[in-house]
């Protein structure tokens, strides 16, 4: 038994050695990044995370438990499962088909995938600032240059600054949160249209908070 314990100890890697390996192999710019901060929401309504502070009614919990028990959760979902979900979303939103629908595990994953899709040498991603922190984080992790364009003091879009930045940097991807996070305001629709017309790259209108604004 003593030999086994000695082998286990010899095979263990100390936290200090792991930290040294991380420092040696992980990109320096990634090491300098700050983690996404989640504030304490005790006794608060988390509008920023779109969380309901109240639990589901007992009857609905029981119904969900029955449906979950009937699923083969030991298997990955099939393509048909995703198709059915897309069709349900298309019906709900009045879409003609499902070809334009992409599903993700929350917006963070979709933002990350979009940043990776445009990650070519010299590519640039742009967004107003301040805005959702994951736009810049997704760009940095993908190794793509990020250009923040400051909002006006009243948090409205600086249309001239945005158009000038678009002309200068020719971004492959522009993120516009509508309504904006964390400022909570809707940008002027004419300003948004001007950005759409001026950009030859992809423009993402992030409408995660549209329910608070009475629609898109």
Residue ranges and their predicted role:
Residues 47, 203-204:
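Residue-level marker for buried hydrophobic side chains located in beta-strands
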Residues 72-198, 204, 209-216:
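Conserved core of the PLP fold type I
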Residues 2-14:
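Intrinsically disordered, low-complexity terminal tails and inter-domain linkers enriched
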Residues 14-108, 113:
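N-terminal small-domain helix-loop-helix segment of the aminotransferase-like
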